[in-house]
């Protein structure tokens, strides 16, 4: 079984998807789980697209794009690699100890069908950018809601935070509200989209 906390540095996106399939093979989901699909798109060398959702009480991941998915994540292979085996993972591990990508946590979002329906009420592109000033790099993912095609050139809302401030949040040295009012979380564009999503996730 692949250890998601110690993935090989040269793992490919497809190898990562295979590791998630393996980790989730024995997991079952409640009857309240949503039948909606989510899509992951990684652009760049070795990238691809995958559709994931629950079928027969199990997580199923297929290559390709589902039509009009309610949630679509678009990123680059470089940003993904920073998250699972690179800079983001290293800094978070320093902050909170052992770090592993937990597919169960992501899957739990879809366990509550009613919550997914609330998220379905939103439409637009939410771009999240992590600024790594020490490395002179930025890592980004765009979350597209509502089933439309992503507008990567002009997202509805962009949220920015530095790596140092993200680490402080992970350590619980700061909280989201305080970080926002201190200007550490910067929102450009439609303020209502991220606030509405946060409200739906917490309800």
State what each model feature region is.
Residues 1-203:
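Feature captures hydrophobic
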């Amino acid at each position: 079984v692949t250890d998601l906390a110690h993935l090989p540095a040269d793992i490919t996106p497809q190898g990562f998807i295979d590791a998630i399939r393996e980790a989730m093979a024995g997991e079952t989901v409640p009857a309240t789980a949503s039948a909606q699909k989510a899509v992951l798109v990684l652009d760049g060398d070795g990238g691809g697209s995958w559709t994931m959702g629950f079928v027969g009480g199990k997580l199923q991941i297929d290559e390709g794009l589902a039509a009009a998915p309610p949630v679509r994540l678009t990123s680059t292979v470089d940003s993904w690699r920073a998250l699972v085996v690179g800079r983001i993972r290293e800094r978070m591990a320093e902050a909170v100890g052992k770090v592993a990508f937990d597919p169960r946590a992501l899957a739990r979002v879809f366990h509550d069908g009613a919550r997914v329906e609330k998220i379905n009420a939103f439409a637009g592109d939410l771009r999240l950018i992590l600024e790594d000033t020490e490395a002179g790099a930025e890592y980004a993912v765009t979350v597209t809601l509502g089933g439309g095609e992503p507008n990567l050139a002009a997202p509805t809302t962009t949220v920015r935070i530095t790596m140092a401030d993200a680490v402080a949040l992970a350590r619980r040295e700061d909280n989201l509200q305080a970080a926002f009012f201190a200007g550490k979380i910067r929102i450009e564009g439609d303020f209502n989209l991220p606030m509405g999503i946060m409200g739906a996730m917490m309800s």
